Amino acid sequence: MSRLSWKKEHKLLRKPEFDLCYEQGKKLFTKSFILFVLCHGSGPSGVRLGLTVSRKKGPAVVRNRIKRVLRSYFRINQEIFQVRADIIIVPKRALDGKTITYALAEKELLPMVGKINKLSCGGE
């Protein structure tokens, strides 16, 4: 399978997984996003991604565009993560979902990758 695939084991899918990340995860902030990062020493390798986009961001077309751009960023850059972590991304109100681009996501999230890789992840 292609190295650019995004398998099911790289996704946060269930409410308990999201709740655990919200409660115990570390918050990181950018201009347009809030990231909840929960490092773990065991489980699937690499990063698992969860996306939460509120209905306040606009109609389904806009919300799906935001999620599509963010998934694309993580799918293409999945190899630069050096930790095992669950990451939830929540767009802030300042983000205009109609004009979000891959370049904007990369500009804001690339510095966060460095911070995520430096997090203390259970002695790894």
Curated annotation (Swiss-Prot):
Organism: Maridesulfovibrio salexigens (strain ATCC 14822 / DSM 2638 / NCIMB 8403 / VKM B-1763)
Designated name of the protein: Ribonuclease P protein component
E.C. designation(s): 3.1.26.5
Gene name tied to this protein: rnpA
Domain of life: Bacteria
Signal sequence interval, chain numbering: none
Purpose: RNaseP catalyzes the removal of the 5'-leader sequence from pre-tRNA to produce the mature 5'-terminus. It can also cleave other RNA substrates such as 4.5S RNA. The protein component plays an auxiliary but essential role in vivo by binding to the 5'-leader sequence and broadening the substrate specificity of the ribozyme.
Matching HAMAP family: RNase_P
One MF term in the entry's GO annotations: tRNA binding
Catalytic activity: Endonucleolytic cleavage of RNA, removing 5'-extranucleotides from tRNA precursor
GO process terms (BP): tRNA 5'-leader removal
